[in-house]
């Protein structure tokens, strides 16, 4: 189908770059009656970040050649003959080292072979084997019923007490339980049982390696972890194991550093773009390019998706600024003008806005139109109507929240979340990523519009991102003058304490993950990359908001991980 066939002609943009005439009325921003955001300046050196675009590691070419040889060796390991449990453990290690994308087909083939094997003696009475098999199969799109855990229950229907001593089995059960669906009560019981008992023994585990794995899992289960972040931690952890495979470890290090060098060049180019926009000089909004690049790597780290990361990071950096305009800086009249301009996707009327807000708006238009132009040039598809629609919907949601604040209206939790799962902004990034990666035979005006309509998969992604954001940021945002968040909405609606409200929101997180998990198995019109993007944006949020607001404020844990994931290569042995 012709990509232009059903597109509204009004959405066909005549020029990529918008140039506005700024009148004296828009010349200065009055600070009178504007709320202060009190954001700290970015702690990142943008000159250094820009230099990453041209940095060259001469050893990298040598490592790439060595990595290709090691890759074939690892492929042979995966396909080799071994005991079923050993095969599962190897696949688990390969995935945790961040190498799943290199061996996708081999892993799926081996897991299918184990799944179709009629023999169950090797796993049916072994909690570790049963749980590891369950998790790996579900992670890779092969459904296994929860009933496989029934054999580990006693006559009263509770998990057998002797399992409390099986720490490795408990750990595998714990990780498996996070792939449960709504209504899978057995997995809920497994989560509670394994969590309680692992917490009871975590300080007394004799094996240092197993003890570290348990504490790491209790802090963040694998299913909720971003693959790239997890790989950086696990590479160091795997190196400490007694039975480490040296060539597998070496390949993981090589691959991590090779991908990191690609990310560094991308980050350098993005830093240059950011400085050229001039928006890095605006002090009333957040400067979050580095955080957004980390988020982009959580969403999709694989080298072949550089254009997806580039668009996602640019849009997310602008979204943070637009969000701050609506939440704190702009007057209600200015916000209505801003929303109208975006809704029309026409800069007529921009002279009614202050200069600083106009700069953000124009950069937003120019960036979106450039992304749309690249889509048309590279894929023959006009994506601008869909990107513009996503921006318009987002700004309308922001405006609704601003009106709530200015009028003193207190929404119910349900009303807040219905608006908030879109105002969290990930629909825009997901729409753009869909346009960039969907197969051309399936990419139509209607299919792109469907993504914009927030179907169930996108809805769960938005809801989880919103809940994580609120758990990490609500107190600070309300202190800045932002609208009530989910925690405060629940407190107002029910009279609950803040502690009780937080526990309720955490419960909603677990329930929303169950809905997301089920979506991953349901018939979907989406190709695999897009499905993964939805889940991975949530994993990025989990990281940034796990211990507070690691997004708006560059906390030590976010900066340390950013340095280890993006800046500092993994040290190699001298002979490498």
Curated annotation (Swiss-Prot):
Catalytic activity: (2E,6E)-farnesyl diphosphate = beta-bisabolene + diphosphate; (2E)-geranyl diphosphate + H2O = (R)-alpha-terpineol + diphosphate; (2E)-geranyl diphosphate = (4S)-limonene + diphosphate
Key words, A-Z: Lyase, Magnesium, Manganese, Metal-binding
Keyword Nucleus annotated: no
This enzyme's EC code(s): 4.2.3.112, 4.2.3.16, 4.2.3.-
Binding residue positions for Mg(2+) 3: 469, 473, 477
Top enzyme class: lyase
Family annotation (InterPro entries): Isoprenoid_synthase_dom_sf, Terpene_cyclase-like_1_C, Terpene_cyclase_plant_C1, Terpene_synth_N, Terpene_synth_N_sf, Terpene_synthase-like, Terpene_synthase_metal-bd, Terpenoid_cyclase/PrenylTrfase
Signal peptide residue numbers: none
GO terms for MF: (4S)-limonene synthase activity; magnesium ion binding; terpene synthase activity
Stored CDD domains: Terpene_cyclase_plant_C1
Pathway named in the protein's UniProt entry: Secondary metabolite biosynthesis; terpenoid biosynthesis
Residues that bind Mg(2+) 2: 323, 327
Span of the annotated motif DDXXD motif: 323-327
Keyword Mitochondrion assigned: no
Cofactor note text: Binds 3 Mg(2+) or Mn(2+) ions per subunit.
GO biological process: one example: diterpenoid biosynthetic process
Residues that, per the record, bind (2E)-geranyl diphosphate: 286, 323, 327, 466, 469
Family designation: Belongs to the terpene synthase family. Tpsb subfamily.
Written domain comment of the UniProt record: The Asp-Asp-Xaa-Xaa-Asp/Glu (DDXXD/E) motif is important for the catalytic activity, presumably through binding to Mg(2+).
Task performed by this protein: Monoterpene synthase which catalyzes the conversion of (2E)-geranyl diphosphate (GPP) to (R)-alpha-terpineol and (4S)-limonene, as well as small quantities of linalool, myrcene, (-)-alpha-pinene, (+)-sabinene and geraniol. To a lower extent, catalyzes the conversion of (2E,6E)-farnesyl diphosphate (FPP) to beta-bisabolene.
Official protein name in the record: (+)-alpha-terpineol synthase
Organism annotation: Santalum album (White sandalwood)
């Amino acid at each position: 189908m012709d990509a232009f066939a059903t597109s509204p002609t009004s959405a066909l943009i005549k020029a990529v770059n918008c140039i506005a005439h700024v009148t004296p009325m828009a010349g200065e921003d009055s600070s009178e009656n504007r709320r202060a955001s009190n954001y700290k300046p970015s702690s990142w050196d943008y000159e250094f970040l820009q230099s990453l675009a041209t940095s060259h590691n001469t050893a990298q070419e040598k490592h790439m050649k060595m990595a290709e040889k090691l890759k074939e060796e690892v492929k042979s390991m995966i396909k080799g003959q071994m005991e079923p449990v050993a095969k599962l453990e190897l696949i688990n290690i390969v995935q945790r080292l961040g190498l799943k994308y290199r061996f996708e087909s081999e892993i799926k083939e081996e897991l299918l072979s184990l799944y179709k094997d009629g023999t169950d003696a090797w796993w049916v009475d072994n909690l570790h084997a049963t749980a590891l098999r369950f998790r790996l199969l579900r992670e890779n799109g092969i459904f296994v019923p929860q009933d496989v855990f029934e054999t580990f229950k006693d006559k009263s229907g509770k998990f057998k007490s002797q399992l409390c001593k099986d720490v490795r089995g408990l750990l595998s059960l714990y990780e498996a339980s996070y792939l449960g669906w709504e209504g899978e009560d057995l997995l809920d019981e497994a989560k509670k049982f394994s969590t309680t008992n692992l917490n009871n023994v975590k300080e007394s585990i004799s094996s240092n390696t197993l003890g570290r794995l348990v504490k790491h899992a209790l802090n963040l289960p694998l299913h909720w972890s971003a693959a790239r972040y997890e790989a950086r931690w696990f590479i160091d952890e795997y190196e400490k194991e007694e039975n480490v495979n040296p060539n597998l470890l070496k390949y993981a290090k090589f691959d991590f550093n090779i991908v990191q060098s690609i990310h560094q060049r991308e980050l350098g180019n993005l830093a240059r773009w950011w400085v050229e926009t001039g928006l890095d000089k605006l002090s009333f909004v957040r400067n979050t390019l580095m955080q957004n690049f980390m988020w982009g790597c959580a969403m999709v780290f694989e080298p072949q998706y550089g254009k997806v990361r580039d668009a996602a990071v640019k849009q997310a950096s602008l979204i943070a600024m637009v969000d701050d305009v609506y939440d704190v800086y702009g007057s209600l009249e200015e916000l209505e003008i801003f929303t109208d301009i975006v809704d029309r996707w026409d800069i007529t009327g921009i002279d009614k806005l202050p200069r600083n807000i106009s700069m953000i708006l124009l950069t937003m238009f120019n960036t979106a139109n450039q992304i749309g132009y690249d889509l048309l040039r590279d894929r023959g598809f006009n994506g601008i109507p869909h990107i513009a629609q996503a921006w318009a919907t987002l700004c309308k949601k922001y405006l609704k929240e601003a009106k709530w604040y200015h009028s003193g209206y207190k929404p119910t939790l349900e009303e807040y979340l219905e608006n908030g799962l879109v105002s969290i902004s990930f629909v825009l990034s997901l729409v753009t990523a869909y346009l960039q990666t969907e197969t051309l035979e399936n990419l139509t005006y209607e299919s792109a519009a469907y993504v914009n309509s927030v179907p169930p998969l996108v809805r769960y992604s938005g809801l989880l991102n919103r809940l994580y954001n609120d758990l990490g940021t609500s107190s600070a945002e309300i202190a800045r003058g932002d609208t009530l968040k989910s925690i405060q909405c629940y407190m107002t609606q029910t009279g609950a304490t803040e502690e009780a409200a937080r526990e309720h929101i955490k419960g909603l997180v677990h329930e929303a993950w169950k809905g997301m998990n089920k979506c991953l198995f349901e018939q979907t019109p989406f190709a695999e990359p897009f499905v993964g993007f939805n889940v991975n944006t949530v994993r990025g949020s989990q990281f940034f908001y796990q211990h507070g607001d690691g997004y708006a404020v560059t906390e030590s844990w976010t900066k340390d991980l950013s340095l280890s994931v993006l800046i500092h290569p993994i040290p190699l042995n001298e002979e490498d």
